[in-house]
């Protein structure tokens, strides 16, 4: 492969993480598993630099490790019908994040920094159960975090996770919130439970917890822990050999664990059930779109195109 030209030799904030995922279900049946993966932690302002500097990383172009802006949060103001203003605009993840945060009352300036912890495409395939955005002001002050939760139906739902008032951890500030899920993630978890997001700014060590809770009880504990690695061609190859086709491994593990839960007799919920509880979803599945269309028709509202996220109140103001 031809040598990739470098843009500069400035130190990068972007990195990789060699990590371990743990799931421990407490109710209604005990179930436990864990496995190793690797993730990318990408400074959104360094994506083009990484594309130029690395042989095995590409932005919006085919490569072994590939980041596509369109795999993540769509711009809420550009996801409707094409018009003169947006028909030629390419997806831009930072612009999309700024627009969504603005709807939540949070201003992310152009010179503010964002780290995105995510699974990139590996050999062209991607599946992300959850990605995390860590937003920092240009001054270095922590602003907020966003959890972008995906599911096997291709939907996305972002959750705003505010700065936690507790003292900073060893690697930086933490973020936490307990918020109603109102989203179909697993067929074995009700829609009306809450997510308890406990996020630590990625540093030398990675520690994230996302638990399912209901009426003060933990139903499912999930942790993501790991160690920081440099983002270099050599490290990309090493981790790719140690965790081959990791994105395929993740989606395969999801279906395998679902089979095990079904065999254990854990109650199962269809996605078409409770569509009224699936709120604030981007790229909504047809089951939600059809339910919304029927509701709109019955109400004779005639408003909205249905191409953006389905309506949802600010989760920060919902009672859990």
Go through the PLM ranges and name each one.
Residues 291-304:
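Long, low-complexity Q/N-rich tracts
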């Amino acid at each position: 492969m031809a040598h990739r030209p470098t843009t500069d030799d400035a130190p990068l904030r972007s990195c990789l993480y060699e990590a371990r995922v743990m799931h421990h279900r407490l109710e209604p049946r005990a179930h436990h598993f864990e496995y190793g993966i690797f993730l990318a932690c990408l400074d959104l302002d360094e994506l083009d630099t990484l594309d130029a500097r690395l042989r095995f990383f590409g932005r919006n172009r085919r490569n072994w490790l590939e980041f596509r802006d369109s795999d993540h949060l769509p711009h809420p103001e550009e996801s409707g019908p094409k018009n003169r203003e947006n028909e030629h605009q390419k997806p831009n993840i930072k612009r999309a994040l700024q627009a969504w945060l603005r709807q939540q009352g949070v201003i992310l300036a152009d010179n503010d920094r964002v780290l995105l912890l995510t699974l990139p495409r590996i050999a062209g395939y991607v599946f992300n159960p959850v990605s995390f955005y860590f937003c920092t002001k240009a001054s270095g002050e922590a602003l907020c975090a966003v959890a972008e939760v995906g599911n096997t139906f291709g939907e996305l739902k972002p959750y705003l996770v505010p700065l936690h008032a507790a003292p900073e951890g060893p690697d930086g500030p933490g973020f936490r919130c307990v918020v109603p899920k109102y989203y179909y993630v697993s067929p074995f978890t009700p829609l009306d439970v809450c997510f308890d997001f406990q996020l630590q700014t990625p540093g030398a060590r990675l520690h994230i917890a996302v638990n399912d809770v209901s009426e003060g009880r933990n139903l499912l504990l999930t942790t993501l822990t790991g160690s920081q690695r440099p983002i270099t061609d050599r490290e990309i190859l090493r981790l790719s050999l140690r965790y081959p086709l990791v994105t395929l491994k993740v989606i395969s593990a999801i279906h395998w664990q679902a089979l095990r839960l079904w065999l254990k007799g854990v109650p199962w919920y269809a996605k078409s059930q409770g569509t009224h509880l699936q709120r604030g979803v981007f790229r909504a599945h047809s089951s939600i779109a059809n339910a919304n269309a029927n509701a709109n028709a019955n109400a004779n509202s005639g408003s909205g195109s249905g191409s953006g996220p389905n309506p949802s109140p600010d989760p920060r103001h919902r009672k859990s």
